[in-house]
């Protein structure tokens, strides 16, 4: 591969950068130096991959969804099974890499933000594994939606701190985590959960998540002798998607990112940042974000706690602007329908986030021939969503 961005200023075209206060600049520069040193150290990379192999369960399987493919009657659908990774989602790939970097830097404490709770669980897990103190900020509303994950984090020894401002969701948890980091940067590592934030975070998280796409590309070629026609992944901040897409960027493969349309992109209740947003700055990075006419960030909505972020990773913004990746949006209802279909036909209950990608894949499969194929990143399992699903499928609906 010859893809080389971001540039030395942390820019993906016009997107990205380091929009942080002076009080954080030294911590950012310390991180950047440590990251460059680590990523050029073969022993560090080996250590990272070995921990993922023997502790997290990599490589994850590539599963041919035979029943689903035959039911739809079009393209063959293959699932990259990040739901099988320890803790139940792709988040551990990144948490593992950053925790190893934190230890290398001599940090004793980890601070993180979480939306659905999966990144929080992954961070608490890895902090327990490596003997690090862990503090996780989580929106008060998300804590109610994801009470099981809150308890998991506490069971793993983490302190979960509610973010009570604004919409009480991921954006606010991120604000609180950054605020805490500013005053504790000497002994604390900020372990960000997606390809967002100031440089070098988007690049670092991508590089720790690209193991998804690297594995999937090799597995797909081994199984089929070719590459998929299309690759599809859901996009909130966008780490599972960029990790899946990155190794395919220079291949003749269509890449589709799927955002949360919530109750419809024509309403105000969605989280379709690329589809409906405008360029602005959020959490230290220039990217697309949901904002009103006065430039104030608007509150995103999705049934999925992991997709309701008002921004998006700057690399996704860049790939959208160049046209290399196509971005679309799927409603709550479409995602839940796809979740039910996969559960019934394949015996796999996906996370609601992943179900957004599945909905688009099922739609695309019917438009393609049986000789063509679609690779979907199944970014996580649906255990955390069972309460929401029970309310929905037993007739209460989701308000």
From Swiss-Prot:
Gene Ontology molecular function, alphabetical: tryptophan synthase activity
Function: The beta subunit is responsible for the synthesis of L-tryptophan from indole and L-serine.
Gene for this chain: trpB
Pathway(s) of this molecule: Amino-acid biosynthesis; L-tryptophan biosynthesis; L-tryptophan from chorismate: step 5/5
Cofactor: pyridoxal 5'-phosphate
Name of the protein this chain belongs to: Tryptophan synthase beta chain
Superkingdom as given in the UniProt entry: Bacteria
Keywords: Amino-acid biosynthesis, Aromatic amino acid biosynthesis, Lyase, Pyridoxal phosphate, Tryptophan biosynthesis
SUPFAM superfamilies: Tryptophan synthase beta subunit-like PLP-dependent enzymes
Pfam families linked: PALP
Sites bearing N6-(pyridoxal phosphate)lysine, chain numbering: 91
Entry GO CC: cytoplasm
Family as reported in the entry's similarity comment: Belongs to the TrpB family.
